[in-house]
Amino acid sequence: MIKLFFVLAIFSSIISYMNIDPMKSSFFLIFSLLFSMPIISMSMHIWFSYFICLLFLSGIFVILVYFSSLSKINVVKSYMSLFLLLISIIYFSPVSMEYTNYLGLSGFYYSIYWFIFSFILICLLFFMNFSSYFLNFSGALRKV
């Protein structure tokens, strides 16, 4: 079941990267977060999944506020989507860990959540790459 949630999270993040409309892209990025939450909450600290969810959603809504008034979007076809999907499923697939080795504070920050941190960082980088690559910034940001 965890693998299913993981594959759905990766799939929705790739669809978020492929989608041209920023509103739909943010919607699929939120789906990616929701599908990755069961994986995060299966670990030792359940409160940490809520913390990640709040930070991620606040970032997504800030991005939506700035990019909702778009006036022009460039359409560019990307053929790397299937390759990115395959590589992310292979590289970031969840594995079972022994929690007795990770009871220290350094294990909490580095060892257990390394793949989760990197997965969320990759999703946000995909979304920011999408935003900076497809937009002309004619009405995206505030004028100075």
From Swiss-Prot:
Keywords (A to Z) from UniProt: Electron transport, Membrane, Mitochondrion, NAD, Respiratory chain, Translocase, Transmembrane, Transmembrane helix, Transport, Ubiquinone
Enzyme Commission number(s): 7.1.1.2
Documented effect of changing residue 98 to K: In strain: JU725
Subcellular location: Mitochondrion membrane
Cellular component aspect of the GO annotation: mitochondrial membrane
Catalytic reaction list: a ubiquinone + NADH + 5 H(+)(in) = a ubiquinol + NAD(+) + 4 H(+)(out)
Segments traversing the membrane: 1-21, 25-45, 46-66, 75-95, 108-128
Job description of the protein: Core subunit of the mitochondrial membrane respiratory chain NADH dehydrogenase (Complex I) that is believed to belong to the minimal assembly required for catalysis. Complex I functions in the transfer of electrons from NADH to the respiratory chain. The immediate electron acceptor for the enzyme is believed to be ubiquinone.
Identification of the protein by name: NADH-ubiquinone oxidoreductase chain 6
Organism of this sequence: Caenorhabditis briggsae
Gene field: nd6
